[in-house]
Amino acid sequence: MAETEKMKYGSLNRFAQAVTGLFLLFFLGVHLYVAHIDFGHPVAFFSSVINQLHNPWWLAFFLIFVYIITYHGINGLNHIVADTSISEKAKRNIGIALMVIYVITIIYGTILALLVARMTVPT
């Protein structure tokens, strides 16, 4: 029974990896267009990001983008570790370390986005 639960969790993790990968394609495309291109013309990156982060919808978009990127990367690393032949204890410890890195990264990303959203746009 424990093996079946482990397999389901692994399948769920791999499914989440695929879904977040698809979301990343969408988010990355929107991010690159909005942050770097304005109807085919280059725009000032820093000012455009600050302007966008003043809008609560764009702020939410970028925060979700950070959460999904971080989850996708950490989960991918965890899959790589799971496929190695190191001990289960080492895998568990690395998994815990990766969770800590995930939490620290999303806290940092959230704080940074909220601070940038409060900045005034340079003229």
Swiss-Prot record:
Transmembrane segments: 14-34, 60-81, 92-116
SUPFAM superfamilies attached to this UniProt entry: Fumarate reductase respiratory complex transmembrane subunits
Organism: Thermoplasma acidophilum (strain ATCC 25905 / DSM 1728 / JCM 9062 / NBRC 15155 / AMRC-C165)
Membrane topology classification: Multi-pass membrane protein
Entry protein name: Succinate dehydrogenase hydrophobic membrane anchor subunit
InterPro entries: SQR/QFR_C/D, Succ_DH_cytb556, SuccDH_FuR_B_TM-su
Keyword Oxidoreductase: no
Cofactor dependency: heme
Compartment(s): Cell membrane
Pathway given in the UniProt record: Carbohydrate metabolism; tricarboxylic acid cycle
GO cellular component, one term: plasma membrane
Gene: sdhD
Keywords: Cell membrane, Electron transport, Heme, Iron, Membrane, Metal-binding, Transmembrane, Transmembrane helix, Transport, Tricarboxylic acid cycle
A Pfam family this chain is assigned to: Sdh_cyt
Cytoplasmic side, ranges: 1-13, 82-91
Signal peptide annotation: none
Topology, Extracellular side: 35-59
Binding residue positions for heme: H72
BP terms from Gene Ontology: tricarboxylic acid cycle
Subunit structure: Part of an enzyme complex containing four subunits: a flavoprotein, an iron-sulfur protein, plus two membrane-anchoring proteins, SdhC and SdhD.
Any one Gene Ontology molecular-function term assigned to this protein's record: metal ion binding
Comment on bound cofactor: The heme is bound between the two transmembrane subunits.
Chief location of this protein within or outside the cell: membrane
Role, per record: Membrane-anchoring subunit of succinate dehydrogenase (SDH).
